[in-house]
Swiss-Prot record:
Keywords in alphabetical order: Carbon dioxide fixation, Lyase, Magnesium
Role summary: Forms oxaloacetate, a four-carbon dicarboxylic acid source for the tricarboxylic acid cycle.
Region (Disordered): 1-67
Protein's UniProt keywords contain Hydrolase: no
EC nos: 4.1.1.31
Organism of provenance: Burkholderia vietnamiensis (strain G4 / LMG 22486) (Burkholderia cepacia (strain R1808))
UniProt cross-references to Pfam families, sorted A to Z: PEPcase
InterPro entries given in the database record: PEP_COase, PEP_COase_bac/pln-type, PEP_COase_Lys_AS, PEPCASE_His_AS, Pyrv/PenolPyrv_kinase-like_dom
Protein name: Phosphoenolpyruvate carboxylase
Biological-process GO terms, alphabetical: carbon fixation; oxaloacetate metabolic process; tricarboxylic acid cycle
Length: 997
């Protein structure tokens, strides 16, 4: 099978729409010249986009092209601005080069023109280093601007649906409640119990493939805001001003360094995460609670829900593979988080003081408010009749004192009491609950005295924010690898003279030693012994966690995740380390005063063997003496984390998903028998290969009984920006998690079709064959490691300053490097860069072929095909798996990937491996078509299909340039601009593909 033919097939499958206007050219005139900035030709936008009737009336009568017209209009507009800026900043020569490359790439993409491909390669090879950087920046920034336009269009379409009075959209709480009502599961009792017991926590993480600089994100945020303004009726003057501001922000983008000069520190990652709280979470999460309560009220359901939706973070606490995370970074993380939330509270309380000018000469206040007013330091005669203002001044001074005692003087900006006024030293709040109690006093009094509407705009959201964020903002998880814990425990045992070589003990003997040490009130650690740097560092993190909990409350740090959990002792070792550092209170295993109040130890099952062993490990853990009492103190809850990344690298896309499914079901059965509430923590990434894809479908496709209102899921560093940089998009993503959790919890039968046993048997057969195919390529093909390191930019990614954590667990010595030692995240990121995205599909085609070929006769084969089709139609798990794979295949490009294969010096190896990949791609595409009935990619999602196709002419030059630059770099060219060009292509391709990493 010749790869060139396959490449042509792939390009035809990804053929672009025929109108050049839809591609969003850098310039919009035929001769490649940009329109003059002064030309006020924007009448289409003014007449079509600013009239309410045009947006809202008769939506059913509009074609898809009509609906997407504003999107392409925005892309053209932003492309024109970028073209103007390129011409202005770099001159006509660079602009013409960029435009010529763009037109050639479009021709290559649309017409399968081999001559255009050769022309493109020649043009790219002739670029000077300076021109190369400019071309890469132009195409990269176009990808960023196209992303902004797409996000705006999603928001626009939702608004149009709302204005038209359309039925609630899937992924909204209103839609979920309608579904529950239809099924008879929307009673007040059912929903009250759901919200009382629920806990939903998105957990922000930082990862080695996070490529966005905060400066770039800030500029993009401004562009998104200004673009949204253009949907409103604007005067000619307002529109001209808007365009000038957009031009200024695009110019600022061009003049801003896209890459970091130095690798991110953990402190940088902390600040990056906090920026999303300021732009999105602090306002949108309380607003989401308001929306949920309003939707419930419409159905006559509970009017107020507890703080079931909270935020988590790994940044500053995740030590696995990152030696830069220490007790000091944990301290920095919690202090910066606390500073952000306390500053927010102070600002909101100050604004409330200006707004709640209620006079008791006109309306009353309850005794509790009067007591707060009397206790206030405010003695102004001008406010003697304004109890709410006086009470708020008292609350403000107590908040300021709370910030001062926790963070130090001057850490959080505090307004003075006025010129010449002495500083007020109020009593700090003991905890955030006391602050919430004071806000509740104000709310209750307003409601009692016809002032409920006064509370709604600011006081109610502030009270909700305080319930959700506390004084800590976000709960920081601690994480470390099990082998590190073992090393520290072994040192403690050895230095105490208990066991000379704990690590060499059998599993049973380890547990005996650990349980004995836990039951002994005497510590193993002595203040008179000097321990290794590793032991001191690890124990220091535990001690810092104890201090943080004392200072900011137990929610500030409450979970400890153990990477590479393979045995029961991996869990118990962390309990012992907690005992040694004072985190565990009471005596382990004692009948009275049993161990409690420590961090919940959470196993992370990552590889295929570990997932298969998960239920056994937890069963044996529960059976240990003292564990039952410990879990009872945890509220009879236990969390288990499942890793999507390593299981995929270990067994491939299909097997990873299936083994996760099986592990979840086994855990559900075990926990049900033990009467323990199971909370699954899904370690999902950005790419489909790492559990990515639409969150709504991902949660709905969970096995029956695995959600039950309890879910935590990672929001990985590399896709946080796409989900939460835009507040409106962020609100939608947060709501989607709630809606999906509601449906998955209270409509579990939707993922338990009648033929489930037959479906699962077929899935097991597919998984076995897929894993064999995947491992045959990745782990059993001689030379595959060399192929991977040559045919992807993995080495160059490792050099890029895109995260505080190294991209590999071990140094990549060419003689000793192994796929097993590479982190799963850069592994997936690299396959995305070369446009193969192998981690999201490889093995499926062979699996389906083997399953169908295994049928004894033609009739049996037909039955198997029918079963697979029924699985796709009636089993959300399988349908979601195929949908995600469909999206990945739409983003693959064998023609581009073949250019990367040319980087492999060994011709025989190159031909052997690449042809195997091409053959599997074709088998997979054919199998998917046979099951779904759709030959083309994303047939059921035309907007996404067009979005992906429209990106290709702007991604292609970046990929071709990346190959050319890597070739020069590896040949010994040390030009700094060349290296910078490679890193810029990595950034641009990641932006174009969106869900990367």
């Amino acid at each position: 099978m010749k790869s060139s033919g396959s490449a042509r097939t792939a390009r035809r499958n990804a053929a672009l729409p025929s109108t050049d206007a839809q591609t969003g050219a850098l310039a919009t005139v035929a001769n490649g010249r940009a329109k003059p900035a002064t030309k006020p030709k924007d009448s289409i936008r003014q007449t079509k986009r600013t009239t309410k009737a045009a947006g809202a009336s008769k939506p059913a009568a509009r074609t898809r092209e009509d609906k997407d017209g504003p999107l392409f209009e925005d892309i053209r507009f932003l492309g024109r601005l970028l073209g103007d800026v390129v011409r202005e900043q770099e001159g006509d020569t660079v602009f013409d080069v960029v435009e010529t490359i763009r037109q050639t790439a479009v021709k290559f993409r649309r017409e399968d023109d081999s001559q255009a491909a050769q022309t493109l390669e020649k043009k790219l090879r002739k670029l000077t280093p300076e021109q190369t950087v400019s071309v890469v920046r132009a195409f990269s920034y176009f990808s960023h601007l196209a992303n902004i336009a797409e996000d705006r269009h999603h928001n626009r379409r939702r608004r149009i649906h709302a204005l038209a009075g359309s039925a609630p959209q899937p992924g909204t709480v209103a839609y979920a409640l309608e579904q529950l009502k239809t099924s008879g599961n929307a009673s007040k009792r059912v929903l009250q119990r759901f919200f009382d017991d629920a806990l939903i926590v998105p957990v922000l993480t930082a990862h080695p493939t996070e490529v966005q600089r905060k400066s770039i994100l800030d500029a993009q945020h401004d562009i998104a805001r200004l673009l949204a303004e253009r949907d409103q009726p604007l005067t000619a003057r307002e529109r001209a001003y808007n365009e000038s501001m957009l031009r200024a922000r695009v110019t600022a983008l061009w003049q801003t360094r896209m890459l970091r000069d130095a690798r991110l520190t953990v402190g940088d990652e902390i600040e990056n995460a906090l920026s999303y709280y300021r732009t999105t979470f602090l306002d949108e999460l309380p607003a989401l609670y308001g929306d949920i309560e309003a939707a419930l009220a419409e159905h006559g359901l509970p009017a107020r829900v507890p703080a079931f939706f909270q935020m988590g973070s790994w940044i500053g606490g995740d030590r696995d593979g990152n030696p830069n995370v220490t007790a000091a970074t944990l301290d920095e993380a919690i202090n910066r988080q606390a500073a952000v939330i306390l500053e927010h509270y102070l600002e909101q309380v100050h604004k409330l003081g200006a707004e709640l000018s209620v006079s008791n000469l006109l309306v009353g206040a309850n005794d509790a408010v009067k007591a707060l007013a009397a206790a206030s330091p405010d003695q102004s005669p001008h406010r003697v009749d304004e109890p709410y203002r006086r009470a708020l001044i008292g609350i403000y001074t107590r908040l300021a004192a709370s910030a001062r005692v926790r963070l130090g003087e001057g850490t959080v900006p505090v307004r003075s009491a006025g010129r010449g006024a002495p500083p007020v030293r109020a009593v700090p709040y003991a905890d955030s609950e006391a602050f919430v109690a004071d806000l509740k006093v104000l709310t209750a009094s307003l409601e009692e005295h016809h002032g409920a509407s006064l509370a709604a705009p600011r006081l109610t959201p502030l009270m909700r924010a305080a319930e959700v964020f506390g004084f800590h903002l976000s709960s920081i998880d601690l994480r470390q690898s099990s082998d590190i814990h073992e090393a520290v425990v072994a040192e403690l045992f050895a230095r105490a003279g208990v066991h000379a070589d704990y690590a060499s003990l059998s599993e049973d003997d380890k547990l005996i030693a650990l349980l004995a040490a836990l039951a002994d009130p005497r510590p193993l650690r002595s203040p008179y012994i000097e321990y290794s740097a590793l032991a001191q560092s690890e124990l220091g993190v535990f001690e810092k966690a104890r201090e943080v909990r004392a200072q900011f409350g137990p929610r500030a740090v409450r979970n400890y995740i153990i990477s590479h959990t393979e045995t029961v002792s991996d869990l118990v070792e962390v309990l012992l380390l907690q005992k040694e550092t004072g985190l565990l209170e009471g005596a382990f295993g004692a009948a009275h005063d049993s161990a409690r109040n420590g961090l919940m130890v959470i196993p992370l099952f990552e590889t295929i063997p570990d997932l298969r062993d998960a239920a056994r490990i937890m069963r044996e853990y529960f059976a240990l003496p003292g564990i039952e009492a410990l879990i009872a103190h945890q509220g009879a809850e236990q969390e288990v984390m499942l890793g999507y990344s390593d299981s995929n690298k270990d067994g491939g896309f299909l097997t990873s998903n299936w083994e996760l499914y099986r592990a979840e079901l086994a855990l559900v059965d075990l926990f049900r028998d033990r009467k323990i509430t199971l909370r699954l923590f899904h370690g999902r990434g950005g790419t489909v290969g790492r559990g990515g894809g639409p969150t709504y479908q991902a949660i709905l496709s969970q096995p029956p009984g695995t959600v039950n209102g309890q879910i935590r899921l990672t929001e990985q560093g590399e896709v946080i920006a796409s989900k939460f940089a835009n507040p409106e998009i962020g609100r939608r993503n947060l709501e989607t998690v709630v809606a999906a959790t509601l449906e998955a919890s209270l409509l579990p039968q939707s993922n338990a079709p009648a033929q489930l046993p037959a479906f699962e048997a077929a899935m097991q057969a597919l998984s076995d064959a897929a894993m064999a195919s995947y491992r045959a390529l990745v782990y059993e093909t001689p030379g595959f490691t060399d192929y991977f390191f040559a045919a992807t930019p993995i080495t160059e990614i490792a050099e890029l300053n895109i995260g505080s954590r190294p991209a590999s667990r071990k140094l990549q010595d060419p003689k000793n490097r192994r796929i097993e030692d590479l982190r799963a995240i850069p592994w997936g990121f690299s396959w995305g860069q070369c446009r193969l995205l192998l981690t999201g599909w490889y093995g499926f085609g062979s699996a389906v072929s083997a399953y169908l070929d295994g049928a004894p006769d033609a009739a049996a084969r037909t039955k198997r095909v029918a079963l697979l089709k029924k699985m796709n139609k009636t089993w959300p798990f399988f349908a979601n798996l195929l949908s995600n794979m469909d999206m990945v295949l739409a983003k693959t490009d064998l023609a581009v990937a073949s250019r990367y294969a040319q980087l492999v010096a060994d011709r025989k190896l190159r031909k052997h491996v690449f042809e195997r990949i091409v053959a599997e791609w074709e088998r997979t595409a054919q199998a998917l078509a046979e099951i779904t009935g759709h030959e083309g990619r994303l047939a059921t999602n035309p907007l996404l299909a067009r979005s992906i196709k429209n990106r290709f002419p702007y991604l292609d030059p970046l990929n071709h340039l990346q190959v050319e630059l890597i070739k020069r770099h590896r040949a010994g060219d040390t030009n700094a601009r060349l290296r910078r060009g490679i890193h810029l292509t990595i950034n641009g391709i990641a932006a174009g593909l969106r869900n990367t990493g």
